[in-house]
Amino acid sequence: MTKNVLVSVAWPYANGPRHIGHVAGFGVPSDVFARFQRMSGNNVLMVSGTDEHGTPLLVQADKEGVTVQDLADKYNRQIVEDLTGLGLSYDLFTRTTTSNHYAVVQELFRGLYDNGYMIKETTLGAISPSTGRTLPDRYIEGTCPICGTDGARGDQCDNCGNQLDPADLINPVSKINGETPEFVETEHFLLDLPALAEALTEWLKGREDWRPNVLKFSLNLLDDIRPRAMSRDIDWGIPIPVEGWQDNNAKKLYVWFDAVVGYLSASIEWAYRSGDPEAWRTFWNDPETKSYYFMGKDNITFHSQIWPAELLGYAGKGSRGGEIGDLGVLNLPTEVVSSEFLTMSGSKFSSSKGVVIYVKDFLKEFGPDALRYFIAVAGPENNDTDFTWDEFVRRVNNELANGWGNLVNRTVSMAHKNFGEVPVPGALEESDKKILDLATAAFESVAANLDQSKFKAGISEIMHVVGEANAYIAEQEPWKLAKDDTKRERLATVLWTALQVVSDCNTMLTPYLPHTAQKVHETLGRDGIWAATPQIVEVTNESPRQPIGVGLPDPEHTYPVIMGDYKTQLAKWQRIDVVPGTTLEKPAPLIAKLDPELGETGPEWAPVQN
């Protein structure tokens, strides 16, 4: 039975190019999942975009001496190019500075406001004494007043998991310039989380199939739930759609209020650009639809508490009741799939400290699938993981090149050399049946892992089949069979068996290694697009909905989006029979081995730090 599956991917912040730590958390896992779901015959919508509001973007624009819109345009395009190069198969990757996004965000806010879940209060806001600019919560650090840990942020303490306000911190300082922030009274709208706590608790306690770290963290947040400010004193953001506020260019909606609405607004934009403006409702209003949210662990709060609270309040499901908004009852997340951090030499990736490997540099030298493979087998799925060049070289050479690449090349080479085509097999022996049965069984078990976002377990099982297939060839010694004319039928059977297992493994590796999978598809003498790739499309800021207020996006503005025609690809999650008589050409090397010295030195653009 076909399922509708929404894959919502965390929105990268557009204040710089992406490094591999970013895509290890939100990028590759979500794409493996989406590609697998499509291959399984499900109706998939995968959306994301660049997050372009908030103080950090203003700070970066000042550093680069450009307008904030120019900065957003610059990094939006860079990120689009990086993610397209990595092969992330978005149905739409857009941005938050669009008229459509502004309008959808304002609709969500109005629904919450009308239902009584947006309350107006006077709070203490942090500003920079030297610039007068508002300091975002995450740009203030100090000692946690609850557990005493240094380095707690103004929104939460990563050590104890409690939500904080900047004014709660002991000895708060600005991360931008180290100065002590000044706290002033200011009026803001707060999301009344306590009024939604009971509904949130009931929903979360039904999420028993979530990753344990995500569920535990999310439930702990309920112990200290409090109203949370959803507006800011800033001139760069979405106008607050309330009379007396919408034309005040000094107050805008909080960047995290608008960013999580992006999953919905991107779905609406996708439907509009696809020619069926109501198609988004399949993924948001149908309660049978499954929705999965992919991100790094630092974003759990916003996806397991803030976003669900917004959805519940919009539908009038909190203690204050309320009416269902114009967009209808919107689906809550089926699962929040959070990854841990990918570090480098034991430290978090940091552009300012030079602890960084940019995606664009990596793609230029090594291509996309080497990085996709490393993240799949050694990424931070359940624990923080350290990236080292030594491990990267080792895994590419020993597993990808010597394992998978060797299996493909020697199998197809021997079949080409001895038959010029896929040979006709004779009667299968027990050894042939055993390896074929192993590959057959892997389809079901790998699928079960991928359906539960257990990507490491999935690829480990596939690579086990690859290893057993290489052992099968070593045991059967087809190069010896080729020297004996009386063994020609046995040679044909062994090579046909090996070709079938290559085909099976290639199918199962497709979500992980789509670019390599297309090459193997062609190496096996097959035509057509096996694994579709995303495309960059230039669009204009057209919108089916119009926002209100001041500081709105230019309706004539053009920008790049990522889209793709994935429904026409041939890849299916099932055995594709290798057909005797199919012409085979001599294969080119599938995966280039890396110089072992690279593991000791790293490349010039990201050398090993001694």
Curated annotation (Swiss-Prot):
Binds 1 zinc ion per subunit. Zn(2+) binds at C144, C147, C157, C160. A motif ('HIGH' region) lies at residues 12-22. Its EC number is 6.1.1.10. Disulfide bonds: none annotated. Its cofactor is Zn(2+). Keywords: Aminoacyl-tRNA synthetase, ATP-binding, Cytoplasm, Ligase, Metal-binding, Nucleotide-binding, Protein biosynthesis, Zinc. A motif ('KMSKS' region) lies at residues 348-352. GO terms for cellular component: cytosol. One of its GO terms (molecular function) is metal ion binding. ATP binds at S351. Is required not only for elongation of protein synthesis but also for the initiation of all mRNA translation through initiator tRNA(fMet) aminoacylation. Monomer. PANTHER family: METHIONINE--TRNA LIGASE, METHIONINE--TRNA LIGASE, CYTOPLASMIC. Belongs to the class-I aminoacyl-tRNA synthetase family. MetG type 1 subfamily. This is Methionine--tRNA ligase. It comes from Corynebacterium glutamicum (strain ATCC 13032 / DSM 20300 / JCM 1318 / BCRC 11384 / CCUG 27702 / LMG 3730 / NBRC 12168 / NCIMB 10025 / NRRL B-2784 / 534). The gene is metG.
